[in-house]
C-alpha cells in the first residue's frame, strides 16, 4: 500500500493548477457572484502563522463558494508603500522598490506553497504606477470638490523618522518605531473632509448587519456623535470669547475654571511674556496625545492671568492651561466642573481649586461625598439660581433657551472624529499631485501628466524625505500660469492606498480608476481581517467607498457586506513575536507535515473569531487524520474503479445507519460552512471517516458515496490531497469544479429508532423499534417486552408518557 507522500502530492497538484490556470476568474454574469477578500498584507518578506490562518480562512470560503456554483473573485495584492520598507531599505542598502519587489516575489511563492486559490492575474501592488496614478487622479477630483484641503496643523513630529505620527502611533510620548521623544510641531498638512461624511458613516452602521458588534461599537465611539451646547465665555477686559462644547449644560452653574490646550492662541500669546508658562507648554509637547493615555497620565496645569466671565452668573472664572485638553478637538477649550466630573475633580484636588456642587441625586438616600470623588450622575439642580429643582432634561432646555436668547450659546451636534490628515513627510509613498505657486497658490497637476512618478534613483537617509532635494522632481512650471513653482514633497498616508484597493481588484487593468466591472463585483461579500483594523482601515475604506459613489464610480453605499475578524495565533498564551521568542515558522511546518496539515490545523483548532493556541500535538493529530483519509482511499481504490451506483432498495440495515450518520454530518457541515464555523466542519469530516471505518459490512456503493462526500467537504481545507484522491479514484478531473454534495433527505428518514424506556423516571431499558409504529403500537410493544414486564408485573400502571421516537416513561404504583 502506498504511503501519504504530501510533498509529491502537493507539488503535482500545484503544477496542475498552474498549467490549467485553475484560479483565474471567469467573467460570467449569468452566475451569482461571490467576492471573497482577505486584507492585503504588507510585504515584510516572510509569512507568519497569523498570515496562514487569515488567508486559509479566506481560501476555505472562496473554494466552498466556488463548489456551490458561484462566480468567485478571490484576488491578492500588496500594501507596498510605507515607512517600514523605507527603513529596511536604508538598513540593507537597497532601494525600497527593489526591497519590496523582492519580498513580494518570495511571499507570493509562500502563498502558492500553501495552495491558496488567488487569481494572480488581478494582482496589484500599491507602489506600482498603474495603481497610484488613479488615486492621484481621485485626490484631484476631491480637491476640486473642496473635500481635500491644506492647512497648518499641530502634529506629533518624530524627530528621528522625520515624519508626522498619528495619535495612535505615539506610545508613552515616544514614536512607535523610532522610540524618539515626540515633539509637537505646527506644519502645513493635507486633509480629507471625513467630517462631511460623519453622519452618514454613523447612520450606515445600521446597514452592517453581518459585521461583528464589537467593530460597529468601536466605529460608533470613534465617530463620537454627541448633542450639546456651545457656551461662550467672554474674556475679561477683551472683545474675545472662548467657546466650549458641553453635553452637560445642567452643570454650567458649577464651572470653577476653564481649561485650554497648550497650543491655544491665548496660551501662546501669554507665554510670550511668561517664561514659566512657556516652559510648561514645552513640557506638554513631550506627552502623549492619545486619549487612552490622557485618561491615565498625571493631570498638570498652569494658572494664567486670563479671566473669563460666566455667561449666566457673570462671575469671574480663572483660565488654566491643562495638559489633558487637545487643540485638535473642538475649540481647544473645556469648561471644568470639579464637583461633577472626575477628571476635573482630580485636577482641582491637585491645585486646591474649590468645588461647587450644583447637582444632587434623585435618590434622597444617596450620600454624596465630594471629598472622595466627583458626583457624575444626572440629578436635580441646586445652587443654580433660577434653574434650581430642574431635572437634566428640563435644565438642558431652560439653559439652552437662556443662552440662545442672550447670544451666549447655541445648540451643537459635535463629532469626536476630525478630518483625516493624509500627509506624510517620507519618501516611500504616493506623491501628492499638487504644485505650489507663489502667484496661484496650491494647484493640482494636470490630469494628462499623471502619474506624478516617485523617483527611484534616490539617496535615502534617515533624515526625512529626499524628494525636497531632487531638483528635477521639485522644480516644475505652474499648471495655471506657467511660472516656476515647487512640487509637493509630502506623500500620502498609506491608509490612502488601502482604502480603495478592494475596488481596483475588480478591474486592475482598466484605463480609468474603475469600470463597469466594479458594480458587478461590489460590494465585497466576505471580508476577512484582524479586529485591530476596526477603526482606521475599515472606517477609511467605508469613507472612500462613499466618496467613490458620489464620484459616480460605484453604486453601492458600503464596501463590505460581511466582515469576519479572525483571532490571533498564540503560543504559550501570548501572541507570537520575535521579542517573546515564540515564533513558529510556517515554512518549517510545511516542510515537515505538508501545507494541507498546516491549513487544516489552523481551521480545526478554534473557531475563526477566537484566538488559536498553537499546539504541536494538534498539528500531529491533524496530520494523522489526513493519513487515515489517504489510507482509506488506498484500501478501497479497487471499489472506486467499478463505477458503482447507489441502489436504495438494496441497502442493508447497516448501510442505512451509516448513510443516516453521513448525511446528518453533511447537513451539519453545510450549516456550519454558512456560519463560518470551520472547526465544526472539520469535526463533521472526522465523524464521516469514523462512520466509514466503524461499519464492517458496508455496501461498496455506500463507501463510494460516503467517501466522495467526505472529500468534497474536506476539499476547501486540504485542497491538494482531495484533488489528488479525486483524480486517483476516478471521481473526476478537478474537485474544485465539482458541485458541493447535497443532503439526501431520504437518508435521514430512519426505518428504526432507539427508544429509551423509563419506569417512574428511571432508565430500565433501550429498545430498537420499527419507525412506522403508531403511539399505541409502541406502548403495546413496550408493555409486552419481557424485560420491561419484569419491572411492572403485579404493579398498577397509572399512566404512560410517550415522547415520540425518543422516550417512554411508565408510571406505576
Swiss-Prot record:
Q: Which UniProt key words apply to this protein?
A: Aminoacyl-tRNA synthetase, ATP-binding, Cytoplasm, Ligase, Nucleotide-binding, Protein biosynthesis
Q: Which Gene3D superfamilies match?
A: 3.10.20.590, HUPs (3.40.50.620), Isoleucyl-tRNA Synthetase, Domain 1 (1.10.730.10)
Q: What is its EC number?
A: 6.1.1.4
- PROSITE patterns, sorted: AA_TRNA_LIGASE_I (PS00178)
- According to the lineage, what is the superkingdom? Bacteria
One cellular component GO annotation, for this chain's record? cytosol
Establish whether keyword DNA-binding is in the entry.
no
Residue span of motif 'KMSKS' region: 575-579
Binding-site positions, ATP: 578
- What single Pfam family name could you report for this chain, choosing any that match? tRNA-synt_1_2
Locus of motif 'HIGH' region: 41-51
What GO molecular function terms would the record report? Answer: aminoacyl-tRNA deacylase activity; ATP binding; leucine-tRNA ligase activity
Cellular localization per UniProt: Cytoplasm
Reaction(s) catalysed by this chain, per the record, are: tRNA(Leu) + L-leucine + ATP = L-leucyl-tRNA(Leu) + AMP + diphosphate
Q: Which InterPro entries match?
A: aa-tRNA-synth_I_CS (IPR001412), aa-tRNA-synth_Ia (IPR002300), Leu-tRNA-ligase (IPR002302), Leu_tRNA-synth_edit (IPR025709), M/V/L/I-tRNA-synth_anticd-bd (IPR013155), Methionyl/Leucyl_tRNA_Synth (IPR015413), Rossmann-like_a/b/a_fold (IPR014729), tRNAsynth_Ia_anticodon-bd (IPR009080)
According to its UniProt entry, one GO biological process term is: leucyl-tRNA aminoacylation
Q: Which NCBIfam families does the UniProt entry name for this protein?
A: leuS_bact
Report the sequence similarity comment from the record. Belongs to the class-I aminoacyl-tRNA synthetase family.
* Name this polypeptide is given: Leucine--tRNA ligase
Q: Which organism is it from?
A: Francisella tularensis subsp. mediasiatica (strain FSC147)
- Could you read off the lineage of the organism from its UniProt record? Bacteria, Pseudomonadati, Pseudomonadota, Gammaproteobacteria, Thiotrichales
Amino acid at each position: 500500500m502506498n504511503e501519504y507522500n504530501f510533498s509529491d502530492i502537493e507539488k503535482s497538484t500545484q503544477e496542475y493548477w498552474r498549467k490549467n490556470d485553475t484560479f483565474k476568474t471567469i467573467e460570467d454574469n449569468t452566475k451569482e457572484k461571490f467576492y471573497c477578500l482577505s486584507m492585503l498584507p504588507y510585504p515584510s518578506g516572510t509569512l507568519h502563522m497569523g498570515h496562514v490562518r487569515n488567508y486559509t480562512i479566506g481560501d476555505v470560503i472562496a473554494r466552498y463558494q466556488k463548489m456551490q456554483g458561484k462566480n468567485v473573485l478571490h484576488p491578492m495584492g500588496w500594501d507596498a508603500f510605507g515607512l517600514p520598507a523605507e527603513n529596511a531599505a536604508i538598513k540593507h542598502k537597497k532601494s525600497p522598490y527593489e526591497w519590496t519587489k523582492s519580498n513580494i516575489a518570495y511571499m507570493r511563492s509562500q502563498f502558492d506553497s500553501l495552495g491558496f486559490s488567488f487569481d494572480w492575474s488581478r494582482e496589484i501592488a500599491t507602489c506600482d504606477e498603474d495603481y497610484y496614478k488613479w488615486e492621484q487622479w481621485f485626490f484631484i477630483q476631491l480637491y476640486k470638490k473642496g473635500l481635500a484641503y491644506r492647512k497648518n496643523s499641530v502634529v506629533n513630529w518624530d524627530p528621528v523618522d522625520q515624519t508626522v505620527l498619528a495619535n495612535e502611533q505615539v506610545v508613552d510620548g515616544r514614536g512607535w518605531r523610532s522610540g524618539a521623544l515626540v515633539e509637537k510641531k505646527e506644519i502645513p498638512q493635507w486633509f480629507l473632509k471625513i467630517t462631511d461624511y460623519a453622519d452618514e458613516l454613523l447612520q450606515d452602521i445600521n446597514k452592517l448587519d453581518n459585521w461583528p458588534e464589537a467593530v460597529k461599537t468601536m466605529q460608533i465611539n470613534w465617530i463620537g456623535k454627541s448633542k450639546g451646547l456651545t457656551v461662550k465665555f467672554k474674556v475679561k477686559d477683551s472683545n474675545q470669547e472662548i467657546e466650549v462644547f458641553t453635553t452637560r449644560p445642567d452643570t454650567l452653574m458649577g464651572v470653577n475654571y476653564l481649561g485650554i490646550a497648550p497650543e491655544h492662541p491665548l496660551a501662546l500669546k501669554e507665554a510670550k511674556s511668561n517664561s514659566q508658562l512657556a516652559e510648561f507648554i514645552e513640557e506638554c509637547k513631550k506627552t502623549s496625545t492619545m486619549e487612552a493615555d490622557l485618561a491615565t497620565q498625571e493631570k498638570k496645569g498652569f494658572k494664567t492671568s486670563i479671566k473669563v466671565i460666566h455667561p449666566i452668573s457673570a462671575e469671574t472664572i480663572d483660565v488654566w492651561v491643562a495638559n489633558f485638553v487637545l487643540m485638535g478637538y473642538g475649540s481647544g477649550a473645556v469648561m471644568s466642573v470639579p464637583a461633577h466630573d472626575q477628571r476635573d475633580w482630580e485636577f482641582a484636588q491637585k491645585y486646591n481649586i474649590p468645588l461647587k456642587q450644583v447637582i444632587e441625586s434623585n435618590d434622597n438616600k444617596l450620600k454624596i461625598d465630594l471629598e472622595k470623588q466627583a458626583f457624575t450622575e444626572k440629578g436635580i439642580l441646586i445652587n443654580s439660581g433660577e434653574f434650581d429643582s430642574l431635572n437634566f432634561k428640563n435644565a438642558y432646555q431652560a439653559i439652552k433657551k437662556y443662552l440662545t436668547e442672550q447670544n451666549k450659546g447655541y445648540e451643537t451636534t459635535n463629532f469626536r472624529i476630525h478630518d483625516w490628515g493624509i500627509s506624510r513627510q517620507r519618501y516611500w509613498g504616493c506623491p501628492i499631485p499638487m504644485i505650489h505657486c507663489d502667484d496661484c497658490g496650491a494647484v493640482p497637476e494636470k490630469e494628462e501628466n499623471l502619474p506624478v512618478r516617485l523617483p527611484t534613483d534616490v539617496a535615502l537617509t534617515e533624515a526625512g524625505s529626499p524628494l525636497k532635494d531632487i531638483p528635477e522632481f521639485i522644480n516644475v512650471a505652474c499648471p495655471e500660469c506657467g511660472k516656476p513653482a515647487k512640487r509637493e514633497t509630502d506623500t500620502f498616508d498609506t491608509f490612502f492606498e488601502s482604502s480603495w484597493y478592494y475596488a481596483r481588484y475588480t478591474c486592475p487593468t482598466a484605463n480609468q480608476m474603475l469600470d463597469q466591472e466594479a458594480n458587478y463585483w461590489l460590494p465585497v461579500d466576505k471580508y476577512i481581517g484582524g479586529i485591530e483594523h476596526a477603526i482606521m482601515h475599515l472606517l477609511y475604506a467605508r469613507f472612500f467607498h462613499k466618496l467613490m459613489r458620489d464620484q459616480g464610480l460605484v453604486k453601492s453605499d458600503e464596501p463590505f457586506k460581511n466582515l469576519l475578524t479572525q483571532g490571533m495565533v498564540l503560543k504559550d498564551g501570548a501572541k507570537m513575536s520575535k521579542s517573546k521568542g515564540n515564533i513558529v515558522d510556517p515554512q518549517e511546518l510545511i516542510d515537515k507535515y505538508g501545507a494541507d496539515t498546516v491549513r487544516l490545523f489552523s481551521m480545526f483548532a478554534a473557531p475563526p473569531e477566537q484566538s488559536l493556541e498553537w499546539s504541536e500535538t494538534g498539528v500531529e493529530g491533524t496530520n494523522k487524520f489526513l493519513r487515515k483519509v489517504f489510507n482509506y482511499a488506498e484500501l478501497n481504490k479497487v471499489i472506486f474503479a467499478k463505477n458503482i451506483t447507489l441502489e436504495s432498495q438494496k441497502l442493508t440495515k447497516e448501510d442505512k445507519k451509516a448513510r443516516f450518520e453521513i448525511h446528518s454530518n453533511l447537513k451539519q457541515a453545510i450549516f456550519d460552512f454558512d456560519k463560518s464555523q470551520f472547526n465544526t466542519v472539520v469535526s463533521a469530516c472526522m465523524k464521516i471517516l469514523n462512520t466509514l471505518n466503524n461499519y464492517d459490512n458496508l455496501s461498496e456503493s455506500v463507501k463510494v458515496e460516503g467517501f466522495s462526500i467526505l472529500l468534497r467537504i474536506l476539499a476547501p481545507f486540504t485542497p491538494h490531497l482531495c484533488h489528488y484522491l479525486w483524480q486517483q479514484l476516478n471521481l473526476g478531473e478537478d474537485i474544485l469544479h465539482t458541485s458541493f454534495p447535497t443532503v439526501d433527505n431520504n437518508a435521514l428518514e430512519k426505518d428504526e429508532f432507539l427508544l429509551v424506556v423509563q419506569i417512574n423516571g428511571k432508565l430500565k431499558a433501550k429498545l430498537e423499534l420499527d419507525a412506522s409504529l403508531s403511539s399505541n403500537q409502541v406502548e403495546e410493544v413496550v408493555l409486552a417486552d419481557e424485560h420491561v414486564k419484569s419491572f411492572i408485573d403485579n404493579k398498577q400502571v397509572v399512566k404512560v408518557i410517550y415522547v415520540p421516537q425518543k422516550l417512554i416513561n411508565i408510571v406505576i404504583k
